[in-house]
């Protein structure tokens, strides 16, 4: 069972000056253990203004973590409140991201599998307009005979031609 991180404005995500009697750590950051989804949420709630995402396995925890941050009143590094929109489909989530970025905002999306394939049409327009949208993809296999929630890169490769730069990471 994967846990959804609880993020609040008091969670200490932004490093503060050390308390009296404490020394600076050699490597700044938060000493913790987490999975890849939690690491993504940690970064995205600090550097974006909004997320448009529709929950789909294996990216549900990322959207849930971002939504938890919004619900708890968390603000990004610039002190701006976060916005989370969960529309009726992945296609609409990508369209929200396109509009938010076109208006000048920093926006992210969390998706995987068939959801990524569904939003392919919008990915072309985002790339064509050179909009700064970040897609966090919990890569997963696609099959024609049944749903598959296992790891794979079929979904990522199915949108390889849309004009986006891609960065992959196997371990956090």
Ranges and model annotations:
Residues 160-168:
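Acidic/polar active-site rim loop that often engages polyanionic ligands
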Residues 1-159:
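Thiamine diphosphate
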Residues 170-172:
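Conserved small/polar residues in nucleotide/adenosyl-binding loops
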């Amino acid at each position: 069972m994967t846990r959804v991180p609880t993020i609040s404005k008091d969670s200490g995500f932004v490093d503060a000056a050390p308390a009296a009697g404490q020394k600076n750590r050699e490597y700044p950051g938060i000493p913790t253990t987490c999975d890849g989804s939690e690491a993504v949420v940690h970064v995205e709630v600090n550097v974006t203004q909004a997320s448009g995402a529709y929950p789909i396995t294996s990216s549900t925890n990322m959207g849930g973590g971002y939504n938890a941050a919004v619900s708890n009143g968390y603000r990004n590094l610039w002190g701006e409140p976060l916005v989370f929109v969960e529309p009726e489909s992945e296609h609409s989530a990508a369209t929200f991201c396109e509009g938010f970025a076109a208006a000048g905002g920093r926006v992210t999306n969390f998706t995987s599998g068939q959801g990524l394939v569904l939003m392919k049409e919008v990915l072309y327009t985002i790339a064509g307009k050179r909009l700064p949208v970040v897609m966090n993809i919990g890569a997963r296999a696609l099959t024609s005979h049944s749903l598959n929630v296992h790891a794979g890169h079929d979904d990522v490769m199915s949108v390889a031609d849309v004009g986006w730069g891609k960065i992959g990471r196997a371990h956090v």
